[in-house]
């Protein structure tokens, strides 16, 4: 069942001025409940504008956004409750922290939901554990933490509201490879624990390939394609034509396959490549030796 749908979603900036521009152009989309969707596209493709419609930060110029089949703009009185159900983490969310302790910052959202203090504290502890923040860190000022820890605090603040849909705009931007993978694993842990739907905007084809089950490709404000990871990345020439690329390991394996190495055309992660190369090595070596 689709948890989020868009019907003819269109958004224009600067209507009636010489600077009028269509940022999202008649987008029809269905996001299944519990899915992990990667959203990719070159700069200016409409990714960020699209996701800001999904929790009502922007109102469509035309079309609808539906949450569980209900138009989110049908009743403005219910908009606040809807935003608790659809959480949005902006790029560089650590710039939005403001409380005097980490615990208070994470608790801000749940308190605004009107929850009992006991429930608020339970959510703080639970979410801190998901993102790897210790009890000692909860007592500290968030402004004294490292960049990666601040990022975790900000993400935890949204997770603590337990949104059914969690949308993240480049949550790993500016982090080193280890920090990037840790953040993505924590997002995956939240999904595993809550069954939430995850929408991840990313410029990293590798991150999307490792974690997403489906990929939405945006181009010039329109849906270029929306399909499984394998089906999207098999369209490498079409992706390159719109300024995107397949994961680097896929390009390496394509080159090896062109030179006679018997690899399949659905390798999109280093782990997949390693498995197939090891199998090929052992076949050619008769099962002898190690790699």
Please tell me what each predicted stretch does.
Residues 15, 64-81:
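ABC ATPase NBD Q-loop/coupling interface
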Residues 141-145, 149:
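Conserved ABC ATPase signature
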Residues 162:
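Conserved catalytic motifs of ABC-family nucleotide-binding domains
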Residues 166-169:
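Catalytic Walker B motif of ABC-type/P-loop ATPase nucleotide-binding domains
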Residues 220-221:
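Conserved ABC ATPase "signature" C-loop
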């Amino acid at each position: 069942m689709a948890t989020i749908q868009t019907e003819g979603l269109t958004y224009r900036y600067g209507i009636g001025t010489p600077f009028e521009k269509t940022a999202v152009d008649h987008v029809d989309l269905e996001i299944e409940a519990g899915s992990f969707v990667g959203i990719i596209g070159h700069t200016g493709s409409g990714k960020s504008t699209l996701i800001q419609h999904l929790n009502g930060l922007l109102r469509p110029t035309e079309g609808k956004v539906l949450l569980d089949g209900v138009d989110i703009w049908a009743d403005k009185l219910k908009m606040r409750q809807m935003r608790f159900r659809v959480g949005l983490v902006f790029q560089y969310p650590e710039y939005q922290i403001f409380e005097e302790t980490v615990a208070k910052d994470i608790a801000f959202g749940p308190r605004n939901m009107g929850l009992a203090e006991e429930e608020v504290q339970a959510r703080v502890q639970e979410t801190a554990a998901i993102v790897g923040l210790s009890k000692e860190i909860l007592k500290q000022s968030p402004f004294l933490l490292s960049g990666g820890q601040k990022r975790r605090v900000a993400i935890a603040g949204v997770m603590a509201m337990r949104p059914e849909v969690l949308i993240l705009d480049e949550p790993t931007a500016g982090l080193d490879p280890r920090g990037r993978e840790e953040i993505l694993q924590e997002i995956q842990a939240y999904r595993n624990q809550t069954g939430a739907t995850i929408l991840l905007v990313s410029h990293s084809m590798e991150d999307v390939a490792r974690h997403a089950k489906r990929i939405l490709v945006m181009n010039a404000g329109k849906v270029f394609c929306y399909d499984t990871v394998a089906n999207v990345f098999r369209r490498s020439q079409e992706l390159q034509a719109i300024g995107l690329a397949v994961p680097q390991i896929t390009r390496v394996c394509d080159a090896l396959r062109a030179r006679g190495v018997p690899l399949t055309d659905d390798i999109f992660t280093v782990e997949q490549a390693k498995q197939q190369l090891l199998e090929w090595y052992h076949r050619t070596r008769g099962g002898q030796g190690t790699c």
